[in-house]
Amino acid sequence: MAELVDHLAELTGFRDRELLDVTLVGALRDLLRPRAVAIYRSVGEAGQERWLTRARLSHDDLAASADPAWIDLDGLPRHEEHPHRLQAFHDQAIVLVAGDPHRAFFPVATDREQLGVMEVESEAPLDERDQRLVMSILRIYRNFQGLLDYSERDTLTGLLNRKTFDESFLKMVAQPAPA
């Protein structure tokens, strides 16, 4: 129980959404001990949606991997290439797929939008207790994303506040341009 509380405290300790995603997959990896856990975001125009890897950790990874912010969207996998992920995203429901590995797909959303899918690969199927654990942590993630949205945006215009805009701008210009 203490480990869970520690992970929740760490999860809600960041204002950076990229770190939040990395912390989320790290917490689930530590708590579930799966082969891998990843969060994928749906990006692109309607009819051309793709899956962007926000954070992925295998059981033996030291650091999470992710797609770079400036990736060419055409190089990302199309929604249709991952039908179980797409089903969880559209139905906003857990999708369980037996096999080697077993896979569980969990919808990830905020109060404003459907973001993507959390995918857990494991040796054995996730039991009900583990599924509830993931859904509960994703609810906390959703609530925290809502708090971030509220604190970062002007309620009248929906525009980023000055501090958030400055941080986002500086982060963007600090990244190397795509080759």
Ranges and model annotations:
Residues 10-63:
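Helix-loop-beta substructure at the N-terminus of cytosolic sensory domains
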Residues 1-22, 147-154, 172:
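A conserved signal-transducing helical linker
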Residues 96-99, 119-135:
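Regulatory loop-to-helix N-cap segments in sensory/regulatory domains
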Residues 124, 133-150:
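Signal-transmission/dimerization alpha-helices at domain junctions
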Residues 149-170, 176-179:
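Conserved nucleotide-binding and Mg2+-coordinating catalytic segments in signaling enzymes
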Residues 86-115, 123:
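Helix-to-coil/beta transition segments that act as allosteric "coupling" elements at the rims
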Residues 52-93:
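Acidic/proline- and glycine-rich, intrinsically disordered low-complexity segments
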